[in-house]
A protein has these predicted regions:
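A shared catalytic/ligand-binding motif for oxyanion handling
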Residues: 1-125
Length: 125
């Protein structure tokens, strides 16, 4: 990849379950390199391809609703364009210790430099 700027979009979507088609169209119509989302409210029933197609690698952390005894909420994700080098950061120890904190992280190599991106959502009390 040649040296260039990257574009990043962030949004708190407050639930994607009923907005997957609109979200997919919005992401498809833009050319962001990285998309960071909080409050996805999604679970295993929603596939990454419903949100991003095949042009992004998706790293996500869905909220464990059973562990927190809630019916919805939380969740974070990062979508990284396929042409960027990236991999998920293992945060399983942190997630175990802080189940009410939704966090996902990835490591990217951009223009020869390593960048770490974390998306964190802490629900208000």
């Amino acid at each position: 990849m040649s040296n260039r700027d990257i574009t990043l979009a962030y949004q708190n979507v407050r639930g994607l379950n009923t907005k997957t088609h609109e979200f997919y169209k919005a992401v498809s119509s833009c050319d962001y390199d990285v998309v960071a989302i909080t409050e996805t409210w999604i679970q295993d029933g929603v596939c990454d391809s419903e949100l991003f197609g095949d042009s992004y690698i998706v790293y996500r952390r869905d909220r464990d609703l059973n562990a927190l005894n809630v019916s919805k909420g939380g969740g974070v994700l990062i979508g990284v364009k396929q042409n960027l080098i990236s991999n998920k950061i293992d945060l399983s120890n942190l997630v175990t210790q802080l189940p009410a904190v939704d966090v996902v992280g990835c490591r990217m190599v951009i223009n020869g430099k390593t960048i770490y991106l974390f998306v964190i959502y802490i629900q208000p009390n």
